[in-house]
Amino acid sequence: MSTINLDNKTILVTGAAGFIGSNLVKRIYQEAPSATVIGIDNMNAYYDVALKEFRLNELAKYPTFTFVKGNIADKTLITELFEKYKPSVVVNLAAQAGVRYSITNPDAYVESNLVGFFNILEACRHCESLEHLVYASSSSVYGSNKKVPYSTDDKVDNPVSLYAATKKSNELMAHAYSKLYNIPSTGLRFFTVYGPAGRPDMAYFGFTNKLVKGETIKIFNYGNCKRDFTYVDDIVEGVVRVMKKAPDKKNGEDGLPIPPYAVYNIGNQNPENLLDFVQILSEELVRAKVLPEDYDFEAHKELVPMQPGDVPVTYADTSALERDFGYKPSTDLRTGLRNFAEWYAEFYK
């Protein structure tokens, strides 16, 4: 692997107002205070834009952070950004997120996750300063796979949602560009990311909003779902470590590039039962005074069948990440949900 020192480098982060993107920008500045970070985000209204503005306001304190409001599906804009800033490292986190939303709004996924990612790849191809492209894939690429834990060595050609299909497509497109144009690229399959200032469409956040309003929360597959919940700080720690080590460029016996390409899982290697997760969340919401001590959780829970596009379990095998980067996520669920509950109490008071 080629080591990259992020100090004094120009780094482009797409989806910079997003949950992972904004936390990544903060982590980059901890790692490399003299870096220049260009953030792009279309600030779409898929969920409350006030959350995105809150995250951006937290990034305003960094003098070398520049925010560009725009869409990665806008090829002219992306081309101009790359020509102007000449990034050394690109982290593509911009994407239309959410499995269930992809069933009713497929066009948004094609625009952002396919056309947008293609524009990033094309810009990387023509960017002489580029040392590493890192991009978000997803645990959803494992689809209906039965073998757990999920390993990056497993076949992943059974997506159960369009979202998953677009993420697998990103890996294939990146592989082709790595092979054709010798672009070092690393895809990261994130597992159920959660934490403060997250996405309201994620279970922990959506459940909290509903419980606060006295509404009933629906627990899918009658509670027989397990998720490898991964705390956002652990995710961005993994991303920064990966950014600093790019797959090596080398040629094969045929004289053509061996694709400088890699894919890793970033997950907690600890699937939690959804009912246990709801129990811990409820305890932490009471502790943070988001909900009263006498709140009747049983009266606000409804067990319902599995949703289309969902899978019963996600479980990350992170042995490759540990081997190559000496890192594995370690934040336990209670600690992470406590941090979320305390943030929620403050943000919505």
Model-derived segments and spans:
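Amphipathic coiled-coil/heptad-repeat helices and related helical stalk/stem segments
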Residues: 52, 74, 203-204, 235
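The catalytic Tyr-centered alpha-helix of NAD(P)H-dependent dehydrogenases
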Residues: 159-166, 190, 196, 200-204, ...
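N-terminal Rossmann-like NAD(P)+-binding domain of SDR-like oxidoreductases, especially those catalyzing
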Residues: 1-193, 272, 279-280, 313, ...
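A glycine/serine/threonine-rich, flexible loop-to-helix segment
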Residues: 148-149, 200-208
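Short coil/turn segments at alpha/beta junctions that flank glycine-rich nucleotide-binding fingerprints
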Residues: 180-184, 200-201, 246
